[in-house]
Amino acid sequence: MNLPRLTMVGNLQVVIENHRGIVEYSPKRVVVAFNQGRLVLEGEDLVIGTIQAEEIAITGKVQSLFFGLEQGRE
């Protein structure tokens, strides 16, 4: 299965596996694409620490996290 996997360390770091790229980035908002939809992280001082083909690590003060499925892709 190629499902997204998220690992959080408190609200200070999120490691995202099985992504399809970054759609939007700012220090207050990061949008990451998946096969099934998108993940939206909002917070303060968000920084992409590492980005690899299958994994992204984002640090900062994460205040909210939303996972949205695209219709017809459940």
Language model features with spans:
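N-terminal intrinsically disordered, cationic/polar leader segments
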Residues: 1-74
